[in-house]
C-alpha cells in the first residue's frame, strides 16, 4: 500500500502515466535482458541464479517458471510471451533491500492484480505495464519469508488481451539465492 501511495501522491502528479510506464519498462527490462545475456551471473542455487551489477551496485536472484499454462474462455491457448521472470532485488543506493518483482512477459490487464500463491497462501501484487510488485516493503518481507519456507510459487494473472496465465516457479534454492544476493550487495 505504501508503494502505491507514494506513486499516487508524489510521482503521478509529476509525470504522465506513459512516462512512468516507459521508465519502469526501461529500468526493469535490464533485469530480464541480464537474465538472458549478462556475463554478471555470479552463482546458481538449484533453480535460482544470482546476478550482480556495479555502478550503481545491484544484486538480484531470479528464476524462470518450471510450468506455464495460458487459458482463454477456459481453454488452453498458445500465446507469445516475452521473458517470464521472478526476482528478488537489492539496490543499496536506493535502499531497496529485498524487493519482489515479477514480469509475465506481456502487459497485464489495467488495474488488475497478480495473485501469488505460495503453498496455499495467497498474496496480491499490484501491476503496472508488464511488471508486478508487492504493495509495501512489509509485504515484500512477508512474501519472501513464505517463499523461503515453500516448495513452489504459482503466479496467476490476466493479460490486457484477456488471457489468463499461470506460472509455476520452483523454490528450490530460493533461500540460498536470496541470501547470496543480499550478502553481495552489503
Residue ranges and their predicted role:
Residues 6-21:
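Bacterial N-terminal signal peptides that target proteins for export
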Amino acid at each position: 500500500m505504501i508503494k502505491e501511495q507514494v506513486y499516487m501522491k508524489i510521482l503521478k502528479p509529476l509525470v504522465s502515466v506513459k512516462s512512468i510506464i516507459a521508465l519502469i519498462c526501461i529500468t526493469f527490462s535490464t533485469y530480464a535482458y541480464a537474465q538472458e545475456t549478462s556475463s554478471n551471473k555470479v552463482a546458481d542455487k538449484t533453480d535460482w541464479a544470482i546476478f550482480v551489477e556495479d555502478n550503481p551496485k545491484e544484486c538480484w536472484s531470479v528464476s524462470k517458471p518450471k510450468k506455464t499454462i495460458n487459458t482463454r474462455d477456459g481453454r488452453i491457448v498458445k500465446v507469445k510471451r516475452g521473458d517470464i521472470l521472478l526476482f528478488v532485488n537489492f539496490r543499496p543506493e536506493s535502499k531497496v533491500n529485498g524487493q519482489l518483482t515479477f514480469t509475465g512477459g506481456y502487459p497485464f490487464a489495467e488495474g488488475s492484480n497478480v495473485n501469488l500463491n505460495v503453498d496455499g497462501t495467497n498474496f496480491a501484487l499490484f501491476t503496472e505495464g508488464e511488471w508486478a510488485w508487492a504493495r509495501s516493503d512489509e509485504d515484500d518481507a512477508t512474501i519472501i519469508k513464505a517463499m523461503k519456507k515453500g516448495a513452489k510459487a504459482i503466479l496467476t494473472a490476466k493479460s490486457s488481451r484477456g488471457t489468463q496465465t499461470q506460472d509455476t516457479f520452483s523454490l528450490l534454492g530460493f533461500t540460498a539465492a536470496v541470501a547470496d544476493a543480499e550478502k553481495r550487495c552489503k
